Amino acid sequence: MNTTEQTSSLPSAGGENGVKLLLKYFPDLTEEQRKQFAALYELYIDWNSKINVISRKDIENLYEHHVLHSLGIARIIRFRAGSSVMDLGTGGGFPGIPLAILFPDTKFHLVDSIGKKVRVATEVANAIGLKNVTFRHARAEEEKQTFDFVVSRAVMPLADLIKIIRKNISPKQQNALPNGLICLKGGELEHEAMPFKHKTSMHNLNEDFDEEFFQTKKVVYVTI
């Protein structure tokens, strides 16, 4: 199935329901974005049956626990056109793929050390016609390019992550928010963030999203 067929085909019930959830919080999605988000359901169901990138117990929560969670980053920043973002430890494409759909004029570079996960993310992005994403199978330490922001979802402790990605943050500023690291994390984070408290801010996603899943979820931003 080519990209045009994939994005224009009728969405599954799972995809339709997922898009309804997203529209609750992002009502301005274009028709193309809605089609792309809807297509994710069948694609991840199919790929997850071959390569486990999402817990099989959690795949039915794809839109709430993975897609909407990824879009939580958009609650603290709207990336300007031409911005560049690296998703470190992307796994099956989170948060990079949902963000790339939401911000089609921003360039996203998705990196993971596990090749089969990179394959899934690449195939999903190709199937929905994303043109603003690139992929690399590599360890974080091997990536030398610079970006406006690095995003990540609970990959490792903040101190370790900051040490690794400091080299990847561009000194050139083009967004309202200074360049840095944006992480999706959960639970008690004050101790973890303490060494960087003067450069760190936390946004509670339960202020934006009603679902119980988000009660302890945060977006952590660190200026680099």
Swiss-Prot record:
Subcellular locations according to the entry: Cytoplasm
Pfam families in UniProt: GidB (PF02527)
Main location (coarse class): cytoplasm
GO CC terms, sorted: cytosol
The keyword ATP-binding is assigned to this record: no
EC identifiers of the protein: 2.1.1.-
Entry's Gene Ontology molecular function annotations: rRNA (guanine-N7-)-methyltransferase activity
Binding site for S-adenosyl-L-methionine: 89, 94, 140-141, 153
Gene3D superfamilies in alphabetical order: Vaccinia Virus protein VP39
Alphabetical keyword list: Cytoplasm, Methyltransferase, rRNA processing, S-adenosyl-L-methionine, Transferase
Reported function: Specifically methylates the N7 position of a guanine in 16S rRNA.
Entry-linked NCBIfam families: rsmG_gidB
UniProt family annotation: Belongs to the methyltransferase superfamily. RNA methyltransferase RsmG family.
Protein name: Ribosomal RNA small subunit methyltransferase G
Organism from which the protein derives: Bacteroides fragilis (strain YCH46)
Taxonomic classification: Bacteria, Pseudomonadati, Bacteroidota, Bacteroidia, Bacteroidales
